[in-house]
Amino acid sequence: MTQGDRQIDLAILGAGCAGLSLAARLAAANSSLRVVLVEPRDGYTEDRTWCGWRLQPHFFEDCNVAEWNHWQLSKDGQTLKRSSQSYPYEMLSASKVYDKALRTISGSRSITLMLGVQATKHREDEGEVEIELDNGKRLKARWVVDTRPRLAAIKHPWLWQSFVGIVAQLRGPEADFERSLPLLMDFQSDAPGLIDFMYILPVGDRSYLFEYTRFSAHRAAAFELESRLQSWLARHAAQAGNSWQELRRESGDLPMAKVEPPGSRRIVLAGARGGSMRIATGYAFHNIQRWADECATTLLQDGKPIGPRKNGFLDWMDELFLRVLQRPDVLPEHVMWSLFAESEPDALVRFLSGQPRIGDYWPVVRGLPWSKFVATAAVNLSPLKSAP
């Protein structure tokens, strides 16, 4: 272990999903690389839920608490059901992911996790990066992987995905929404956001994740989303005679925006900040796992980290999609509904997960309002003209 003013091989700034995933891979491979993770939080709790379609096996597969081969959308009393036998939609427990990563890392003599510490500034020289910490210490690292959340403001056409959710156990008679399948989007047509929807996952024993989500140009106020979540529960659960016990809660704001340029020659951006999050959906966990595998392999072979894979065409399509959603002559929830209703499910899953095959594009876009997309593309066709 080397810290203070002594040189290390790799500093990982931010020990959330991406930072822990990379460090756990290195520890599992018995890497001798000297690694320090710098994380502001003092400890880990069940603070979030990671979900998405599992396209390949991954390191944390045994941390899922539920998975489904079928899912649903709901709009104006209609229900749309879709399925994939190839790609299950899985829900992962944050505490299980954290515990597995921390156990794996603790078995390494060359990896140190510094909790309750922040990196305040850095200076890059020819052969190293010097990092100042808020505890007065310094790290000198050959390479840096920066996974900390982006701080920059976002501009049109980019959006915020804001959400407030609870995991609750119902008590009483069966309510109208109680199903064994995940409800990915229950559109709330009377809400002020560009798109508002309920996201509901059944986790067993009449326990559910209830999440109120909004896509909008500005961060939504948490108290407003909380109010709408409670109103929804009152309409659909309380009126059916149910009470519920809140087990935990989660909230967040995801920037649905183009990623920043690479940090520098010796600083690699990773996680959502580096491009692992799909702009148009917010899904990130499984892409982070793919990156962690690839980055760990490169570090073990060459001693040098790499960032997430970039797909400029997908980024362009995401920008075009978000621009169309914000047209005054478009009903965004109708576009989202058509996307799921008209697309071949496996192709759509690969597309939404950021891993489309060449033959997936047409099965995905054929059901969308072509005239709106063509008109929007004609004005904004230069690849990704807008500012990050």
Region locations from a protein language model:
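Helical element adjacent to the flavin cofactor pocket in flavoenzyme catalytic cores
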Residues: 91-114, 236
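Predominantly flavin-linked oxidoreductase catalytic cores and closely associated redox partners
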Residues: 25, 108-240, 244
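Glycine-rich, N-terminal phosphate-binding loop of Rossmann-like dinucleotide-binding domains
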Residues: 15, 148-149, 271
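C-terminal helical "tail/cap" subdomain of flavin- and related membrane-associated enzymes
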Residues: 293-388
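N-terminal Rossmann-like FAD-binding beta1-loop-alpha1 element of flavoenzymes
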Residues: 2-36
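FAD/FMN-dependent oxidoreductases across multiple families
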Residues: 118, 190-192, 213-295
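N-terminal FAD cofactor-binding segment of flavoenzymes
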Residues: 25-78
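Flavin (FAD/FMN) cofactor-binding and adjacent substrate-gating region
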Residues: 57-85, 104-107, 121-126, 193
